[in-house]
Amino acid sequence: MRTKAIAAAAILLIWSVLASVTAAGPSQTHHKPSRDEATKAIRASAYEMMKAFLTSDVETFKRHSAKRTLELVSLVFEAARQDPRYQQELQNARITNADQFLGYFLQGMATQYLQAIPLSPEAAARRVANDSAVSFITDSEAKVIAGDSEVARARLVARVWKIDMTDSLKKAVLKEVNDPELRARIKSL
């Protein structure tokens, strides 16, 4: 089932991105936030996104995701829906839209993760988040780094930091998508 392979690869990459950022309180001030305040806000957003992943909370996950990441999820759903190899699986799971598609695979991957690590979603999100770094590119964009690798970008959109995992996910997704038009749309994100 290549749909599961696509989703599993995407979700594993999502998890690695989200698992690398710590929790902190968001900054909602009107002045230009300091880098420390921005770092705290980025980590807060990523923590909430990780917790949403572990609890299969699609709405919260989406709220903290960058638009590009959500567009990628929609394109992956479209690719799976159009591919005859995946249509039965989507039908059996009663998946009719990108949100259900995202929720279905978040739930499966979160269940596996939480079975392997016997912690609450909150504790797991905090635990795996302690080894990340935030490196600013500009005042409105930063790299989220785990170990020696960039795993995501954080982008400031309307004074809220959104986590953009698109570039980290595209390579794995493109390996599984065969439709030339969808491949081109994914590459253009």
Summary of predicted features, one role per range:
Residues 9-19:
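Bacterial N-terminal signal peptides
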Residues 126-189:
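Low-complexity, intrinsically disordered terminal/linker segments enriched in charged
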Residues 20-59, 63, 67-75, 79, ...:
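Short, low-complexity N-terminal intrinsically disordered segments enriched in polar/charged residues
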Residues 1-10:
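Bacterial N-terminal signal peptides that target proteins for export
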